[in-house]
Amino acid sequence: MTKTLPEDFIFGGATAAYQAEGATNTDGKGRVAWDTYLEENYWYTAEPASDFYNRYPVDLELSEKFGVNGIRISIAWSRIFPNGYGEVNPKGVEYYHKLFAECHKRHVEPFVTLHHFDTPEVLHKDGDFLNRKTIDYFVDYAEYCFKEFPEVKYWTTFNEIGPIGDGQYLVGKFPPGIKYDFEKVFQSHHNMMVAHARAVKLFKDGGYQGEIGVVHALPTKYPFDPSNPEDVRAAELEDIIHNKFILDATYLGEYSRETMEGVQHILSVNGGKLNITDEDYAILDAAKDLNDFLGINYYMSDWMRGYDGESEITHNATGDKGGSKYQLKGVGQREFDVDVPRTDWDWMIYPQGLYDQIMRVVKDYPNYHKIYITENGLGYKDEFIESEKTVHDDARIDYVRQHLNVIADAIKDGANVKGYFIWSLMDVFSWSNGYEKRYGLFYVDFETQERYPKKSAYWYKELAETKEIK
């Protein structure tokens, strides 16, 4: 039976400033840590990415034509404040006003994120969010944007607090490239949640029009053998690191006993301690019921086994299937040999995990208000067919269809899910994979910057028009 989605459902496309704009040092933009990190460590940079800085009118015209009625955009903090604070860059401000005006002209609602992995380099060098001064600078930047851009009706403080700490201090694939430092992981998560809570409270106290929330990446964690207590515990601990710690901070205004027991266990095994003040808890508590929505980014689930060795992670950045290893001291190891399809980058394709995660939020955090699926999509080595000027991306269509079906199930079962944003609107630059891993509805020729609708774009258009998942 064909499932349908609600009439008022948002069918969106997602982007991010650093992954789409290019123009990394144009019109007064300040540097971000990624500029230096990519120059020193990788064979690619974010220049020109998808040249969204200049070509946003083309992408928004395509959005309108293909039924995309919402777009996730992030403001590059260093375009507004090149150093993260102090002097404002008027050309950056003007750019975003023009961008939001074009969104509205094309009837594409902008959902705007204040921070998407791109802290200005000046602040990043000074400890990023491990330095509590960065919290103050972020809140000042947020307040400036709330005042300056009243045309924005949907604000998100952060994109993926979990993967930021994870990438910077656990896997070591984000600048500054530190590995297995759990103290920094949890402290980064916590400090960013304090920054989020302060910004949300400021937004509500200031009487700004519109809605505000946060986007969390929530990969579902399962025990490899549900009857093995070690596997069950490994899944619980992995869930605390990636999901429960930040969800508790968002909606409980504190960390539950189970969460803190898990954190203390991980820190006792690996070393380190967490600095949380009474004032922090008061800030989290004051904001816990003020989030208008939760954005969930979901791509995959993981299966965990007990493990008592040292930490070792091998990140698959090449798209050669089977190149991943993930084992953490005091936590567990991910088992990749499970009967579940996976992408070339070893991401497990498991739509049921999205359903389970949505219903977990509904059950454990009833003050969630509403949910948007703010990222979901399939990274693929797309094959461009020159004679047809398109990509036959049936695997992407199938991936999205499967995930939309479980979203429809979750809505039927009582979850208030209001929209879906495919990652990504057009092909963009990937943080740790460069330009080979493509996600877009629109194929981008990165040499010419021409856009070509993929088969998935036509499928998505019909979906947006009929609301039927075919």
Curated annotation (Swiss-Prot):
One of its GO terms (biological process) is lactose catabolic process via tagatose-6-phosphate. D-galactose 6-phosphate binds at residues 19, 116, 159-160, 297, 430-431, 437, 439. Gene3D superfamilies: Glycosidases. The active site is at 160 (proton donor), 375 (nucleophile). InterPro entries: 6P-beta-galactosidase, Glyco_hydro_1, Glyco_hydro_1_AS, Glyco_hydro_1_N_CS, Glycoside_hydrolase_SF. It holds the Pfam family Glyco_hydro_1. SUPFAM superfamilies: (Trans)glycosidases (SSF51445). One of its GO terms (cellular component) is cytosol. GO terms for molecular function: 6-phospho-beta-galactosidase activity; beta-glucosidase activity. Keywords: Glycosidase, Hydrolase. Pathway: Carbohydrate metabolism; lactose degradation; D-galactose 6-phosphate and beta-D-glucose from lactose 6-phosphate: step 1/1. It is an enzyme of class 3 (hydrolase). NCBIfam families: lacG, PRK13511.1. Belongs to the glycosyl hydrolase 1 family. This is 6-phospho-beta-galactosidase. It comes from Staphylococcus aureus (strain MRSA252).
